[in-house]
């Protein structure tokens, strides 16, 4: 039941990224799927020519199992845990039958915009087929975003739901309509100093900065992370250039960073933020940090041969990089 947070951010370019919070790593890699890599599907014809994709994937049997990715057109998509609510079906005759692990490649290989993705999803049936015996079905829901709009996609027992996502963030449970509704409880929070509306005849004092957001959840539960990252993202201010935008994006997601020791699982292990990503979806650059490496590492898809046929893979740089000044 690992937890994660995804967010979008727009300055002059469009940014999309996520945290992966878990107790161990599968050796995921920054993986580029070039335009002529043959994408095979269990129940659909292969796609041999498509948009190039860059993202974080666990590669098994030369297939990119993407956790989050963008394509060369600037569309981003991430899968986040949705345990207990995700529901996948047997094949249906009049639908595009797509396995859950094929969903990100299916959309990002063919769609340039969220609108195009929405049209494909209206015809889709997500299958309860695992990738392999070693890699069981992941119970997920998804955020899909371009620079204009975001949607959340949830495959639940009564079908596939497509929600408009006006905040451009996603965590885990509960279902997305309930997540959005919970923001009503925090509409009084502000980035400004509060005025005394408690009682006019009491002389109440602002004894600290930041009191306008007292009540913003600080714990690591998925509902609380949703509220917190939404507040941080919606109030975010930064410069427009690349370094300032990327730096600010990592600050947004670091507001829900999981430190080892704060979230103990029943088996005694601890959930941590294994990696944090930030994609410049406009320029096709994938930036990331890991739990032990604060230095931002980048892979630029346009420095590769995007007309190739083979996956291009970069293992994560995980050790801390410290820049000595003397």
Where are these regions (language model features)?
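A contiguous strand-loop segment
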Residues: 2-95, 123, 128, 315, ...
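C-terminus-biased signal that marks the final domain/tail of proteins
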Residues: 2-15, 129-130, 137-138, 147-149, ...
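Short, flexible loop/turn elements at secondary-structure junctions
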Residues: 20, 81, 146-148, 157, ...
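Short, surface-exposed beta-strand-loop junctions and turns on beta-sheet-rich folds
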Residues: 22-24, 83-85, 158-161, 168, ...
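Proteins synthesized as precursors that undergo proteolytic processing into mature forms
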Residues: 94-130, 242-250
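Aromatic- and glycine-enriched pocket-lining scaffold segments that form the walls
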Residues: 118-154
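Aromatic/basic-lined ligand-recognition segments
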Residues: 150, 154-159, 165
């Amino acid at each position: 039941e690992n937890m994660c947070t995804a967010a979008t951010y727009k300055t002059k370019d469009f940014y999309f990224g996520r945290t992966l919070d878990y107790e161990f790593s599968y050796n995921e890699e920054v993986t580029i799927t070039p335009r002529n890599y043959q994408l095979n599907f269990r129940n659909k014809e292969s796609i041999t020519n498509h948009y190039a994709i860059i993202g974080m994937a666990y590669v098994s049997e030369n297939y990119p199992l993407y956790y989050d990715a963008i394509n060369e057109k600037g569309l981003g998509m991430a899968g986040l845990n949705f345990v207990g609510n995700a529901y996948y079906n047997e094949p249906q005759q009049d639908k595009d039958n797509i396995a859950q692990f094929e969903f990100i490649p299916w959309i990002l290989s063919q769609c340039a915009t969220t609108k195009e993705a929405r049209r494909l999803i209206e015809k889709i049936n997500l299958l309860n087929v695992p990738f392999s015996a070693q890699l069981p079905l992941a119970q997920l829901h998804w955020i899909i975003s371009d620079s204009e709009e975001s949607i959340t996609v949830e495959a639940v027992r009564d079908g596939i739901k497509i929600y408009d996502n006006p905040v451009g963030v996603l965590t885990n449970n509960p279902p997305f309509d309930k997540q959005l509704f919970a923001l009503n409880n925090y509409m009084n929070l502000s980035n400004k100093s509060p005025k005394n509306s408690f009682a006019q005849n009491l002389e109440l004092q602002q004894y600290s900065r930041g009191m306008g957001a007292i009540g913003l959840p600080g714990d690591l539960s998925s509902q609380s992370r949703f509220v917190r990252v939404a507040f941080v993202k919606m109030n975010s201010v930064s410069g427009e250039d690349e370094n300032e935008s990327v730096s600010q994006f990592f600050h947004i997601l670091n507001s829900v960073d999981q430190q080892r020791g704060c979230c103990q699982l029943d088996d005694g292990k601890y959930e941590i933020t294994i990696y944090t990503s930030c994609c410049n979806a406009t320029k096709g650059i994938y930036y990331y940090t890991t739990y032990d490496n604060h230095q931002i590492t980048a892979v630029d898809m346009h420095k590769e041969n995007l007309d190739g046929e083979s996956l291009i893979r970069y293992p994560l740089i995980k050790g801390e990089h410290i820049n000595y000044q003397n």
